[in-house]
A protein has these predicted regions:
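Catalytic Walker B motif of ABC-type/P-loop ATPase nucleotide-binding domains
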Residues: 165-168
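Conserved ABC ATPase "signature" region
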Residues: 118-135
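Helix-to-loop junction immediately C-terminal to a conserved catalytic motif
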Residues: 54
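Conserved catalytic motifs of ABC-family nucleotide-binding domains
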Residues: 161
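ABC ATPase NBD Q-loop/coupling interface
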Residues: 63-80
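Conserved ABC ATPase signature
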Residues: 140-144, 148
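Conserved ABC ATPase "signature" C-loop
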Residues: 219-220
Length: 269
């Protein structure tokens, strides 16, 4: 299973006075089971890119493949794609709307045509996966903490049993404890379910801690793609894009400049 983008381009407002080219010839391939960090400053194109990956936006030019099939081919089942490639938007708790947590998480599976019993079984499993026990089932989602709301929203996507989970800034607005809890749950999903994870973030510290591979976007283009240690070697270029490498990267560089022999593969503490 893989996602493959070939010469992907996207233009907002094409043919109008407000035309804006958001993606330029993006080429990438994401393999089954990878944990990919997608990073870039505001306006870099990362959010536009992920909306292509599950078919919410159609490219202005280029091709996109899922499991070897061109999703732009005639008759392709976009509904099936969106159930396999789950997308959690930034501030997803704003989309919570049901009277209680369990009912809210059941919404996606029911929309897939599952019975009430099947949907509830999926929802309970998803809530367990994000660390919410049965005591939360009948609680109003609006009475939960910010981190708990975020986990309910993620469970709503997991209940649809996607093969790929894309998260757009999943820790935005959370306190440090809430941020760590969310990221640890995502990491656990990757390790225990071998789920493909695409984590969109502007935090180098977060992606260095969890991701196996980093893709850096800037002005709609893919500028770096590789292991964290390879990408962080370009920390001077990253700074020109409004990004900063993890603090440990600067420390290692300073130590080496002062003649101290230290492993420069270190990306986290």
């Amino acid at each position: 299973m893989s996602i493959k983008a070939v010469d992907l381009n996207f233009v907002y407002g094409g043919g109008t006075a407000f035309e804006q080219h958001a993606l330029f010839d993006v080429n990438l391939e994401i393999e089954d089971g990878e944990f990919v960090g997608l990073i870039g400053h505001t306006g870099s194109g990362k959010s536009t890119l992920i909306q292509h990956l599950n078919g919410l936006i159609k490219a202005s030019a280029g091709e996109l493949y899922y499991n070897g099939e061109n999703i732009y081919s005639q008759g392709y089942d976009m509904k099936q794609l969106r159930s396999k490639v789950g997308l959690v938007f930034q501030y997803p708790e704003h989309q919570l709307f049901e009277v209680d947590v369990l009912t809210d998480v059941c919404f996606g599976p029911k929309n897939q045509g599952l019975s009430r019993e099947e949907a509830e079984a999926r929802a309970k499993k998803a809530l367990e996966q994000v660390g919410l026990d049965p005591s939360y089932y009948k609680q109003s989602p609006f009475e939960l903490s910010g981190g708990q709301k975020r986990r309910v929203a993620i469970a709503g996507v997991l209940a649809m049993e996607p093969e790929v989970l894309i998260l757009d800034e999943p820790t935005a607005g959370l306190d440090p404890r809430g941020r760590d809890e969310i990221l640890d749950q995502i990491d656990r999903l990757h390790r225990e379910r071998h789920m493909t994870i695409i984590l969109v973030s502007h935090s180098m510290e977060d992606v260095a801690r969890y991701a196996d591979r980093l893709i850096v976007m800037n002005h709609g283009q893919k500028v770096f793609d590789g292991a964290p240690k390879e990408v962080f070697c370009h920390y001077r270029e990253l700074e020109t894009m409004g990004l900063a490498a993890p603090q440990i990267t600067y420390l290692v560089h300073d130590l080496k400049e002062n003649g101290i022999d230290i492993d420069d593969d270190i990306t986290t503490v």
